[in-house]
């Protein structure tokens, strides 16, 4: 039978919330007895926006804004049924986007 792995990708704008969520997932998986790889930090995506400060003139005066999207990757190797059930019951912070692939 083929080994079944679960890959969890987490994304958030705030890295503190993201680290807390990954720690919660890692503790839950370790408690159920499955082996885990990670959390692996993926490259942070930085989007910059440049806007004119004044409404009419002064092209030289501009303001820059940026959004940073932090990412983490967790691999669960050979998950037990208790692991899957515990992950489904897990309640994470609202600012974290979770993507799960089996």
UniProtKB/Swiss-Prot annotation:
GO terms, molecular function: structural constituent of ribosome; tRNA binding
Q: Name one GO biological process term.
A: translation
* Protein's UniProt name: Small ribosomal subunit protein uS10
Q: Which domain of life, per UniProt? A: Bacteria
Q: Which UniProt keywords apply?
A: Ribonucleoprotein, Ribosomal protein
Hey, which family's this protein in? Belongs to the universal ribosomal protein uS10 family.
Subunit comment for this entry?
Answer: Part of the 30S ribosomal subunit.
Q: Which InterPro entries match?
A: Ribosomal_uS10, Ribosomal_uS10_CS, Ribosomal_uS10_dom, Ribosomal_uS10_dom_sf
Q: What does this protein do?
A: Involved in the binding of tRNA to the ribosomes.
Q: What is the lineage of its organism?
A: Bacteria, Pseudomonadati, Pseudomonadota, Alphaproteobacteria, Candidatus Pelagibacterales
Tell me what organism the protein belongs to: Pelagibacter ubique (strain HTCC1062)
- Chain's gene name: rpsJ
> Where are its TM segments located?
none
Fetch the Pfam families from UniProt: Ribosomal_S10 (PF00338)
Q: Name one GO cellular component term.
A: ribonucleoprotein complex
Q: Does the keyword Ribosomal protein apply?
A: yes
